[in-house]
Amino acid sequence: GETVEHFTDGLETYGDQADRWIVDLRGNGGGVVDAAIGAVSTFSGSGLLAYLKDSDGSYGAFGSNDEALTTAPVIVLADENTASASELFASDVRDTGVGIVIGSRSFGKGVAQIVLDENSLPGYFDNGDAMKITTYRFYAPGGGTTDTVGVIPHLLVDPDLADEVAVLLCSPAPEGSTEGYLRLDFNRVWYISLEQASSPEYQAAFTALLEALPVGVTLQSGTGSSWAAVEPAAVAEACGLTGYQSRGFSDTAGSPYASLIDRLAAYGIASGSGDGTYNPEGSLTRAELCALLAKALNCRVPTGESRFTDVSMDDWYGMCVNAVAALGLVEGVGGGRF
């Protein structure tokens, strides 16, 4: 189709000039599943790229037999309006390891529809009438669905800064001395020029990038002849990024779950106590569990009356409890109470 031709033409025309690719899917509401699979295969090559599940629970596998047109990594930009087939493209990039996703969590429409009209069912529809029916839920190669949950980007940043963050990651590998560069090992190897990143034009994006780095991702600073591990906070201080704020918590270092807690914080799922602490040894109430699950699952905000007599929709946890209950993940204690 036209989408795949666009990607093919771009990669073939500029392939000898580019060592990074950026696909901006911010505000892209999706389209045809086949187009998303064909487009992402220009980066990933042959293999399975999606599974579609119908109402009977049967799965169909979809993929490509074509070879990749580039070995350079791709950066996908996403926001809350990146939806449907665009989310499949982003999740394919994530699961195949051919690049990273930058921006905010996507919309969460992981279903496909068919259209019944006079062409597909002549005699049943006329005068331009048609009916659209949701028939499939799709899953990425790794087995996860984007439906409701959406795609959580590798680097969770303000979508308005996503393009500038991507540009910072497009610095070429240093030739000779590594001094003045950062190296980021995250799905692929990325380089950041400190001169560019510290400039007034890119300081906000650089700050956002450092804040978004999750635990376990290796950040290194050039020493001239080699690389040395460095913490994002140390880089921010050295570069005078006064607006930098770590998303981690001050009281998790001694916890056996510290890395997991801080990773959830990096992706905006765990918010802690509001004062920079998490209280990792504390107990979790049922309401707090629902709040955590609702955030992790990207639950839709419920409307109407609460299904529990002791939970008001005006309570800070009211919408979360009702959203998670609507999914069947929690139940009340009986008598209409939670």
What kind of region is each of these model predictions?
Residues G1-Q245:
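C-terminal "post-core" interaction segments
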Residues Y267-I269:
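Short proline/glycine- and basic residue-enriched helix-capping loop/turn segments at helix->loop/beta transitions
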Residues S91-D92, L264, L289-L293:
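Amphipathic, non-transmembrane alpha-helical segments in extracytoplasmic/periplasmic proteins
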Residues S44, R94, A265, A325-A326:
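Alpha-helix C-terminal capping/helix-coil junction sites
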Residues A85-S86, R286, C290:
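Active-site nucleophilic cysteine motif
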